[in-house]
């Protein structure tokens, strides 16, 4: 039996008002509405498609055997004005709508209906720069705006998601009891903490999604090495992934991959083998890669994961290339059990690289955009409810507890030891892919980053000499102080170069 004693706001002679208004009744919106209600809050809902809100409330009342829909504590409304009028002050309007122009459309409609101090929350996958703009715009009108990343899919929306709010901090004290109540919990801690000002919440969600792209591609590369390279059956794949999910690789994505390998189609054959090998994407991984380029951060693994999806989408072209550029058939003849372990090492090490690159990107963004991110709290928020929840997120939290100014997770003791332990197997797995002509773009790029990051000397001295040769871009010398720049007349036909002129 549900109870609603604490959060329903009423006064004598007044009708009962709602704690929160929710716009958007697609899959995520519906499940969030039920989650909010299940935690003792009354929620008013609105959907622009006529009849959807009424049908949702009526269906839920029927499913839950509630005779009077008023007792459902989910109130269907038929206009934005009715939605707003149903809310107590300060009003909280939570939008779960498609990112982009739709968000601005609803903001435009809500502004004249709201009063100073009211709050609009965008729970979609909005680009953080759009959230920056919306925070500033609404602040000028005396309204508060929160951009909140929500991860966890349909199940998380209903039973507890990872929630990453940022924007106008003045609004946090009002929405905190609701959002922390409905978020996932790990060890009694809510997977929802204030992230930072302006678009910080949506920025962190963007990086989360980039890491998600990386994790998924890494698993796919392990799958191809195991199935195509080692010839494992689906029953054997199931056993391998089930074992991995009981150890250091334990994570949501490994868990669901195990389930996928176990699932059979109507004819008893593995369903996954009947799915066309073309991957879709909604753009958040691409946003992460673009932002990394803008900040000058080597987000190599996530970039390769995005490109792998792009390549998969070129199915017809790949079919033509497969006929024109046939691979040499090579069979694996080594110790299969040892190679399975090596692939597991590669998956783990590359996964650590993905998180290290993601957190390094957030560190740079925090400085550039003045987000003041708390990386330990971010790791805590990702432990439950979300798609990238993994066992070692606790280790990330501990790393930042020890050193809040940690430059890169790879420098923490846990990561140092983990990488040293996995390195030999990681290299064997990449070599296997090379020998068998099986592409491993994320395994390989992660290894290249790892080797590059720990290289005291890289060949960029030659690169800078080339730049100076053809473009007079100057260079620094190792026998001179940093910050002093030189140009060489490499051909004897050049001219003078300064910081502001080029006459060579």
Which positions does each model-derived feature cover?
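Interdomain hinge/lid region at the active-site interface
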Residues: 202, 227, 232, 239, ...
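Rossmann-fold dinucleotide-binding core
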Residues: 103-106, 121, 127-238, 246-270, ...
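NAD(P)+-binding Rossmann beta1-loop-alpha1 motif at the extreme N-terminus of oxidoreductases
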Residues: 9-91, 113, 117, 153-158
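Hydrophobic beta-strand scaffold residues
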Residues: 43, 76, 145-146, 299, ...
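Small-residue-rich helix-loop
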Residues: 244, 366-399
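C-terminal amphipathic alpha-helical interaction region
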Residues: 428-429, 434-504
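Glycine/threonine-rich flexible loop motifs
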Residues: 92-109
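Generic secondary-structure signature for well-ordered alpha-helical cores
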Residues: 34, 38-41, 61, 85, ...
């Amino acid at each position: 039996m549900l109870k609603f004693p604490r959060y329903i706001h009423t006064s004598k002679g007044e009708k009962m008002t709602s704690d929160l208004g929710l716009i958007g009744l697609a899959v995520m919106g519906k499940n969030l509405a039920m989650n909010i209600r299940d935690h003792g809050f009354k929620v008013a809902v609105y959907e622009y498609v006529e009849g959807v809100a009424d049908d949702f409330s009526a269906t839920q009342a029927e499913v839950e055997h509630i005779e009077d829909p008023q007792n459902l504590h989910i109130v269907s409304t038929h206009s934005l004005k009715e939605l707003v009028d149903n809310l107590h002050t300060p009003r909280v309007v939570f939008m779960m709508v498609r990112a982009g122009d739709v968000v601005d459309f609803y903001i435009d409609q809500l502004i004249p209906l709201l009063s100073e101090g009211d709050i609009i929350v965008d729970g979609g996958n909005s680009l953080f720069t759009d959230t920056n703009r919306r925070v500033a715009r609404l602040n000028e009108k005396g309204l508060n705006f929160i951009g909140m990343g929500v991860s966890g899919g349909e199940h998380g929306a209903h039973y507890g998601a990872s929630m990453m709010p940022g924007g106008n901090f003045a609004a946090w004290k009002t929405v905190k009891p609701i959002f922390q109540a409905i978020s996932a919990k790990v060890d009694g801690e809510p997977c929802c903490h204030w992230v930072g000002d302006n678009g910080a919440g949506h920025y962190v969600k963007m990086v989360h999604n980039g890491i998600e792209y990386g994790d998924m591609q890494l698993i796919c590369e392990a799958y191809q090495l195991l199935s195509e390279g080692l010839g494992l059956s689906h029953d054997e794949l199931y056993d391998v992934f089930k074992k991995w999910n009981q150890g250091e690789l334990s994570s949501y994505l490994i868990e669901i991959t195990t389930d996928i390998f176990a699932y059979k189609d109507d004819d008893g054959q593995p369903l996954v083998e009947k799915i066309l090998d073309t991957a879709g994407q909604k753009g958040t991984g691409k946003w992460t890669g673009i932002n990394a380029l803008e900040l000058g951060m080597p987000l190599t693994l996530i970039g390769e994961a995005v490109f792998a999806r792009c390549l998969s989408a070129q199915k017809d072209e790949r079919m033509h290339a497969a006929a024109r550029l046939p691979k040499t058939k090579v069979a694996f003849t080594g110790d299969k059990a040892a190679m399975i372990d090596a692939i597991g090492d590669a998956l783990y090490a590359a996964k650590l690289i993905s998180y290290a690159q993601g957190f390094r990107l957030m560190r740079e963004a925090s400085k550039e955009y003045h987000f003041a991110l708390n990386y330990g709290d971010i790791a805590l928020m990702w432990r439950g409810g979300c798609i990238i929840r993994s066992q070692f997120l606790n280790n990330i939290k501990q790393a930042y507890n020890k050193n809040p100014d940690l430059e890169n997770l790879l420098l923490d003791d846990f990561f140092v030891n983990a990488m040293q332990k996995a390195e030999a197997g990681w290299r064997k797995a990449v070599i296997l892919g090379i020998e068998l002509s099986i592409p491993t773009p994320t395994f390989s790029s992660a290894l290249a980053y790892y080797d590059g990051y720990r290289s005291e000397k890289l060949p960029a001295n030659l690169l800078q000499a080339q730049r100076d040769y053809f473009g007079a871009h100057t260079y620094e010398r190792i026998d001179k102080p940093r910050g002093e720049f030189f140009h060489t007349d490499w051909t004897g036909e050049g001219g003078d170069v300064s910081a502001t002129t080029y006459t060579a």
